[in-house]
Amino acid sequence: MKNAYYIGLMSGTSMDGVDAVLVDFSGPQPQLICSHTEAIPSHLLKGLQRLCLPGADEINRLGRLDRNVGQLFALAVNNLLAKCNIAKEDIIAIGSHGQTVRHMPNLEVGFTLQIGDPNTIATETGIDVIADFRRKDIALGGQGAPLVPAFHQQTFAEIGKKRIILNIGGIANVTYLPGTSEHVLGFDTGPGNTLIDAWIQHVKSEPFDKNGEWAASGKTNPDLLAQLLSHPYFSLAYPKSTGRELFNQAWLEQQLSPFNHLDEEDIQSTLLDMTCHSIARDVIKLSPEGELFVCGGGAFNTQLMQRLAALLPGYKLDTTSALGVDPKWAEGIAFAWLAMRNHLGLPANLPAVTGASREAVLGGRFSAK
């Protein structure tokens, strides 16, 4: 059978690098052929973080960063192809998520904005790019997120098996696969790594808390935990999605101001528990028992996985490796899959998940010619 090669590009709310994956969709399950992470240069990272919050001269900064991020994504593709020793002519299309700089679906006229100019990516790689996946769903009255549940359904669902796929990036999202003819459900539970990363970056200038070791050295403060979990987002009904617009460094500092007597590691432990408790609450609402498979950066945080398991005794906990998909690359593979769906003219959103009025083909194609 002829190979069906697509490339997926993903940079999430953690902004910890651009993940590039080469995936073959010619078989019954996606096959990861090769992967690469392109580091985000510090000057670009600072520019993106600044753009995620309201500020002056935004349009000029947005335009420049749109091109800069496109160039970085193109570099990630070219380095991936060199690593895999695959010719660009063998790739059907690139699926690029871009970099989210605003996600505001609940305004009177909701919107979401990802940058990383697909014209630049197509021109600098010589490969057609499919991008702008979220805005069709928003135009149909949906949240534009999460989009990965449709991929999870096709890849991980099994009749008779009640499964939850938990993706823990900067924001955490769940996909409920009932194992029956019931609707698949999915939504963002709230912060994943974004606040625990922000705190260790602020205090220790380290990019992330490896294995949750710093959190493990602290003791959770129940009063701070209760305050953090009182955020209105956690009591919203789904469909719902969120991002840095709600959960960011400024919000965290505001929450911490009455607790400045706490040790820094105790705050880290409490932030980790906020992530775990908010996830566990939503998982239990979906089903008190079943199988839970974790992907994303959080799958590699030992302390997070241990605390989550303790909060979910009715669940068998594992990573998506057990289902044949490397948890580090799962979201990149999903965006390669979204590109394939667009190329074939097939819908890729789940209205029961996003709240859109109907299924739709997502994304637009940007030719390399």
From Swiss-Prot:
Enzyme Commission (EC) number = 2.7.1.170
Annotated organism of origin: Shewanella sp. (strain W3-18-1)
Query: Coiled-coil intervals in this record?
Result: none
Q: Read off the SUPFAM superfamilies from this record.
A: Actin-like ATPase domain (SSF53067)
Which cysteines form disulfides?
Answer: none
Catalysed reaction equations from the record: 1,6-anhydro-N-acetyl-beta-muramate + ATP + H2O = N-acetyl-D-muramate 6-phosphate + ADP + H(+)
Q: In which pathway does it act?
A: Amino-sugar metabolism; 1,6-anhydro-N-acetylmuramate degradation; Cell wall biogenesis; peptidoglycan recycling
Would I find tRNA-binding among this entry's keywords?
Answer: no
Keywords attached to this entry: ATP-binding, Carbohydrate metabolism, Kinase, Nucleotide-binding, Transferase
Q: Which Pfam families does UniProt cross-reference here?
A: AnmK (PF03702)
| Name of the protein in its database record | Anhydro-N-acetylmuramic acid kinase
Please list the GO biological process terms of this entry. Answer: 1,6-anhydro-N-acetyl-beta-muramic acid catabolic process; amino sugar metabolic process; peptidoglycan turnover
Free-text function comment from the UniProt entry: Catalyzes the specific phosphorylation of 1,6-anhydro-N-acetylmuramic acid (anhMurNAc) with the simultaneous cleavage of the 1,6-anhydro ring, generating MurNAc-6-P. Is required for the utilization of anhMurNAc either imported from the medium or derived from its own cell wall murein, and thus plays a role in cell wall recycling.
Q: Which family does it belong to?
A: Belongs to the anhydro-N-acetylmuramic acid kinase family.
Residues noted as binding ATP in the record, renumbered to the chain: G12, T13, S14, M15, D16, G17, V18, D19
Does this UniProt record's set of keywords contain Ubl conjugation?
Answer: no
| GO MF | ATP binding; kinase activity; phosphotransferase activity, alcohol group as acceptor
The EC category is: transferase
